[in-house]
From Swiss-Prot:
It comes from Kineococcus radiotolerans (strain ATCC BAA-149 / DSM 14245 / SRS30216). [4Fe-4S] cluster 2 binds at residues 181, 185, 188. Catalyzes the methylthiolation of N6-(dimethylallyl)adenosine (i(6)A), leading to the formation of 2-methylthio-N6-(dimethylallyl)adenosine (ms(2)i(6)A) at position 37 in tRNAs that read codons beginning with uridine. Residues 482-510 are annotated as: Disordered. Pfam families: Radical_SAM (PF04055), UPF0004 (PF00919). Keywords: 4Fe-4S, Cytoplasm, Iron, Iron-sulfur, Metal-binding, S-adenosyl-L-methionine, Transferase, tRNA processing. This is tRNA-2-methylthio-N(6)-dimethylallyladenosine synthase. The lineage of its organism: Bacteria, Bacillati, Actinomycetota, Actinomycetes, Kineosporiales. [4Fe-4S] cluster 1 binds at residues 28, 73, 107. Residues 167-397 form the Radical SAM core domain. InterPro entries: Elp3/MiaA/NifB-like_rSAM, Methylthiotransferase, Methylthiotransferase_CS, Methylthiotransferase_N, Methylthiotransferase_N_sf, MiaB_methiolase, rSAM, rSAM_horseshoe. Its EC number is 2.8.4.3. It catalyses: N(6)-dimethylallyladenosine(37) in tRNA + (sulfur carrier)-SH + AH2 + 2 S-adenosyl-L-methionine = 2-methylsulfanyl-N(6)-dimethylallyladenosine(37) in tRNA + (sulfur carrier)-H + 5'-deoxyadenosine + L-methionine + A + S-adenosyl-L-homocysteine + 2 H(+).
Length: 510
């Protein structure tokens, strides 16, 4: 294996300038988690994040990063359009800057493989979901060999959580407990791209959480394609409930969330663990997809309406203040008016605090894409509008019912787009609702990561407002200290690129 230290194209060999990078993320929380790893890998190899690299005043230096990485999603058709649209915008930029590199990873890369380079020959690197850790090597190999590198593996090379990371938040963190999925939903391409479920050992998960808390993290979200089948690899069907309870013993960890469970394998033990463990938050994301038993069967979702509503009842009985969110697909092939009415019925009964609603999008390679009776676009659109109107009403009513409640809000950074104009700060309630709150006159603003006690004065359609400052209080936290320390940290200096191995090429899969 050879090792080289690269300099930007055209640079004097005696001057080693650090190359800048930018990661653009599309899709789910798993991709956000993986993007933090991609950033960590690049910084470990000597790259500097583009928005921190700076540009001297009056400088004619390029305003584009040296490396752009797309971490892609393949769940919906517009994901393809978004990627190739972005790549098209970069083509003339790269023509002006031959030393620039473009890499494409994630689920769409795993799916399209060499097709990406055929459609966009200015792309330098294509890597998949199973070899995230190979990015620096592939970038260097592409520069060294002056040709695109396409490397897609069929099984997981390294569990992403073991890779270097650059976390976006000093007070909240994603922790992956598993990757892949053993379900075979007919509309979903993710299992084909992420592979079969692979679980981390509980001790490894807890050790990562303890290390994060030691750095100041106050909240973690446990990640998996189906968190409540966690343990299938090591033969423990109750492993997820045990893991939740174990997080309750980690001193300094105040908030635990998880996403995403599957109704078919959601057990009473998990509900009990949520109710019994104080730092597990009263919020639950439970994907419905459809309220029709006939459609659920066609989707190959191994539960029916009665089981789903039974789970909702069980959660509400044990955790009365729980906010439950969901995913719903409208217009699945063969969905009739009666099927859709069943979905509306479940939404009325379940009273979700919010819902991610999607118009069905056929994905090549999935069984649903070749099913007959694809629903006309105008019918799907009409149903979608009826569903969103119903859910918007329920969300608004539910938010209005929060008026008068006193909540502990984890102060967040960047959650409130109008905070400067409204002179409010923003954060998340225990049930994960967004809260915009006012400060008493002359009060010192809490830091992101601190916890503010506020009283809700208004439930808006998509958030809560807390303008009554009479009971306002702030608890300064180690998470806030961590945020403050990060702000005070000097901008990273350009130390130049570090040696990166070219690696041993694997069989090219295009």
């Amino acid at each position: 294996m050879s090792t080289t230290t690269a300099t930007p194209a055209g640079a004097d060999d005696t001057v080693a300038a650090a190359r800048t990078y930018q990661v653009r993320t599309f899709g789910c929380q798993m991709n956000v988690h993986d993007s933090e790893r991609l950033s960590g890998l690049l910084e470990d190899a000597g790259y500097v994040r583009f928005d921190e690299a700076g540009r001297p005043e009056g400088s004619d230096a390029p305003v584009e990063p040296d490396v752009v990485v797309f971490n892609t999603c393949a769940v919906r058709e517009n994901a393809d359009n978004k990627l190739y649209g972005n790549l098209g915008h970069l083509a003339p930029v790269k023509e002006r800057r031959p030393g620039m590199q473009i890499a494409v990873g994630g689920c769409l890369a795993q799916k399209d493989r060499g097709e990406i380079v055929r459609k966009a020959p200015w792309v330098d690197v294509v890597f998949g979901t199973h070899n995230v850790g190979s990015l620096p090597v592939l970038l260097e190999r592409a520069r060294h060999n002056a040709e695109a590198q396409v490397e897609i593996l069929e099984s997981l090379e390294t569990f992403p959580s073991t890779l270097p990371t650059r976390r976006e938040s000093p007070y909240a963190a994603w922790v992956s407990i598993s990757v892949g999925c053993n379900n075979t939903c007919t509309f979903c391409i993710v299992p084909a791209l992420r592979g079969k479920e692979k679980d981390r050992r509980p001790g490894d998960v807890l050790a990562e959480i303890e290390a994060l808390v030691g750095e100041g993290v106050l909240e973690v979200t446990l990640l998996g394609q189906n968190v409540n089948t966690y343990g299938v690899e090591f033969g423990d069907k109750l492993a997820f409930g045990k893991l939740l309870r174990a997080t309750g013993g980690i001193e300094g960890l105040e908030r635990v969330r998880f996403t995403s469970p599957h109704p078919s394998s959601f057990t009473d033990d998990v509900v009990d663990a949520m109710a019994e463990t104080p730092n597990v938050m009263p919020s639950l994301h439970m994907p419905l997809q459809s309220g029709s038993d006939r459609v659920l069967k066609a989707m190959r979702r191994s539960y029916r309406q009665s089981r789903f509503l039974g789970i909702i009842d069980r959660v509400r009985s044990s955790i009365p203040d729980a906010a439950i969110t969901t995913d719903i697909i409208v217009g699945f092939p063969g969905e009739t008016d009666e099927d859709f009415e069943q979905t509306l019925h479940v939404v009325e009964q379940a009273r979700f605090s919010s819902a991610f609603t999607f118009q069905y999008s056929p994905r090549p390679g999935t069984p649903a894409a070749t099913m007959g009776d694809q629903i006309p676009k105008r019918v799907v659109q009409e149903r979608y509008e009826r569903l969103t109107a119903l859910q918007d009403r329920i969300t608004y009513e539910d938010n209005q019912a929060q008026t008068g409640r006193t909540l502990e809000v984890l102060v967040a950074e960047g959650e409130g787009r109008k905070d400067a104009a409204t002179r409010r700060l923003s954060g998340r309630a225990p049930d994960n609702r967004l809260v915009h709150f006012a400060l008493p006159e002359g009060a010192q603003a809490p830091r992101p990561g601190d916890v503010a006690t506020v009283t809700v004065t208004r439930g808006a359609p998509h958030y809560l407002e807390a303008d009554d400052v009479s009971g306002f209080a702030v608890r300064r936290t180690r998470a806030g200290d961590a945020w403050e320390a990060r702000q005070a940290r000097p901008e990273p200096e350009s130390t130049g690129p570090r040696p990166v191995g070219l690696g041993l090429p694997t069989l090219r899969r295009a």
